[in-house]
């Protein structure tokens, strides 16, 4: 009986932590989408289907499917005609938009 109770408690704790992690990931995704569409104005130049953007100045993010590190580097430092956003966007906003783009581009 004690073992059954311990298994129940550990399963319950796992589910609680999993839901907290999921909520944080959803919050980060939504913040990233907001940055993509508004603060960063990424949609003005990039195509990303999830954001409903169909611009042709920068690369189509659905086609190149960049990983998080590549996105962070490009957003912070700029690349080609894309301006550096470090100092314009906070580190939190840069991480959020990188998270959003990396997940959305995979779909």
Annotate each PLM feature.
Residues 55-107:
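Extracytoplasmic electron-transfer domains, predominantly the class I c-type cytochrome c fold
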Residues 25-29, 33-36, 96-106:
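Extended, non-globular or repeat-rich regions with surface exposure
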Residues 16, 23, 33-36, 62, ...:
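Short N-terminal micro-motifs specific to bacterial/archaeal maturation
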Residues 27-48, 63, 77:
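Sequence/structural segment immediately N-terminal to covalent heme-attachment motifs in c-type
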Residues 1-26, 107:
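N-terminal export/targeting leaders of redox proteins
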């Amino acid at each position: 009986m004690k073992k059954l109770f311990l298994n129940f408690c550990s399963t319950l704790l796992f589910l609680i932590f999993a839901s907290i992690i999921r909520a944080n990931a959803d919050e980060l995704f939504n913040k990233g989408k907001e940055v993509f569409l508004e603060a960063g104005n990424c949609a003005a130049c990039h195509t990303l289907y999830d954001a409903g953007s169909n611009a042709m100045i920068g690369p189509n993010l659905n086609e190149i499917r960049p990983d998080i590190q590549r996105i962070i580097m490009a957003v912070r430092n700029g690349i080609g005609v894309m301006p550096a956003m470090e100092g314009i966007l906070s580190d939190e906003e840069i991480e959020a938009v990188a998270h959003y783009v990396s997940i959305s581009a995979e779909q």
